[in-house]
C-alpha cells in the first residue's frame, strides 16, 4: 500500500520514547479511533512541535500512513505525524495531584475502551467533556465525584456499565442498602442475591448507593448539594473499576494514588460486609491496589 495522508482530530493519551529524539504518540481520534503515530524530533529541547505532543492536548492532525504490504494490518503499523495544530489543551490539570490523577485515570480508561480504525466520536467527545469538568473543579474535594461520574459515562459508551440505580435482575428500584456484583451486572437486591447464590458480592451502604444512583445523570449536583463523604465516592469508584478490570482483564494503574490523594484509609473505602450478608471474599476482591505510582505512569505518557 502506498503512503497517503489523512486529517483527524485527536487527543494525545500516551507517549513512548522512540530512539533518541522521537516519540510514539497514542491518540484517540474522532474519525479513526485509536491511532499510533511517530512525532519525529518531539523529544528534542527545541522541537518544532512545542507542547503539541504533550498529554491531554487536542490537535488537528495531518497523518502520513507510511508504506506497507497489503498483507500487513494497518493498526499494527506506525504512522507519522506530518502536521499538528492545537485546538485545545488543559493546563490547569496540573494544579494538584488529584486533578492529574483523575485526568490520567480517564485517559487510561479511554485507552482500554477505544477501538482502532473506526470512528469513536462519542468516546472522544465524552472524554474531552469530562476532562473540561475536572480541570474546572475548584478544589480537590470536587474532583473525585467528577472522576467517578466520568468513569461511569465512559463505561456506558464502552457498553460495560453496570446497573447503578435498580437491581440488574428484577429491575426493582433500590433504596437504603443493596449489594453489588461486578461479575453479574451491578447492583442486586437481597432476594435476587439469595436466589441466585451470588458470590462474591459487596454490601453497598446507603451513601454509596446514593453516589452510584446519581451517575446516569448528565451532570452532578453542586458540591454543596451532594454533600456525600469522599469515602462513599471512593467506594463507588472501586466498584466501577472492578467491572472494568474484569472486562479488560487488567488493572487500572492510575487508580493507585486515589486513596492517598484524599487521605482516606483504604479500609474506609471498602464496602463493608456485615455478618451474614454478602461474602467475605468481597473485601479481598475490591481491595487490590496496583503498585504503580502516578509519577511513573505519567512518565509513560
Swiss-Prot record:
Residues 272-301 are annotated as: Disordered. It comes from the Bacteria. One of its GO terms (biological process) is double-strand break repair. Coiled coil: none annotated. GO terms for cellular component: bacterial nucleoid. The keyword RNA-binding does not apply. Keywords: DNA damage, DNA recombination, DNA repair. Pfam families: RecO_C, RecO_N. Belongs to the RecO family. NCBIfam families: reco. Involved in DNA repair and RecF pathway recombination. HAMAP family: RecO (MF_00201). This is DNA repair protein RecO. The lineage of its organism: Bacteria, Bacillati, Cyanobacteriota, Cyanophyceae, Synechococcales.
Amino acid at each position: 500500500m502506498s503512503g497517503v495522508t489523512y486529517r483527524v482530530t485527536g487527543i494525545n493519551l500516551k507517549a513512548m520514547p522512540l530512539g533518541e529524539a522521537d516519540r510514539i504518540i497514542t491518540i484517540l481520534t474522532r474519525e479513526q479511533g485509536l491511532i499510533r503515530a511517530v512525532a519525529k524530533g518531539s523529544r528534542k529541547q527545541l522541537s518544532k512541535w512545542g507542547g503539541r505532543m504533550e498529554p491531554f492536548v487536542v490537535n488537528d492532525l495531518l497523518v502520513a500512513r507510511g508504506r506497507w504490504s497489503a498483507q500487513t494490518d494497518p493498526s499494527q503499523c506506525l504512522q507519522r505525524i506530518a502536521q499538528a495544530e492545537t485546538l485545545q489543551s488543559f493546563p490547569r490539570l496540573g494544579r494538584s495531584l488529584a486533578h492529574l490523577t483523575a485526568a490520567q485515570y480517564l485517559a487510561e480508561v479511554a485507552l482500554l475502551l477505544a477501538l482502532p480504525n473506526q470512528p469513536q466520536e462519542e468516546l472522544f467527545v465524552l472524554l474531552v467533556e469530562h476532562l473540561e469538568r475536572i480541570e474546572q473543579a475548584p478544589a480537590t474535594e470536587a474532583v473525585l465525584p467528577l472522576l467517578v461520574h466520568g468513569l461511569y459515562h465512559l463505561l456506558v459508551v464502552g457498553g460495560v456499565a453496570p446497573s447503578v440505580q435498580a437491581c440488574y435482575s428484577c429491575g426493582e428500584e433500590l433504596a437504603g442498602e443493596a449489594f453489588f456484583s461486578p461479575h453479574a451486572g451491578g447492583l442486586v437486591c437481597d432476594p435476587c442475591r439469595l436466589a441466585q447464590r451470588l458470590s462474591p458480592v459487596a454490601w453497598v451502604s446507603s451513601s454509596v448507593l446514593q453516589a452510584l444512583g446519581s451517575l446516569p445523570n448528565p451532570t452532578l449536583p453542586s458540591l454543596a448539594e451532594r454533600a456525600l463523604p469522599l469515602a462513599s465516592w471512593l467506594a463507588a469508584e472501586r466498584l466501577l473499576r472492578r467491572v472494568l478490570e474484569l472486562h479488560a482483564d487488567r488493572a487500572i494503574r492510575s487508580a493507585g494514588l486515589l486513596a492517598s490523594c484524599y487521605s482516606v484509609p483504604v479500609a474506609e473505602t471498602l464496602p463493608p460486609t456485615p455478618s451474614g450478608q454478602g461474602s467475605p471474599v468481597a473485601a479481598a476482591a475490591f481491595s487490590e491496589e496496583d503498585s504503580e505510582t502516578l509519577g511513573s505512569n505519567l512518565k509513560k505518557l
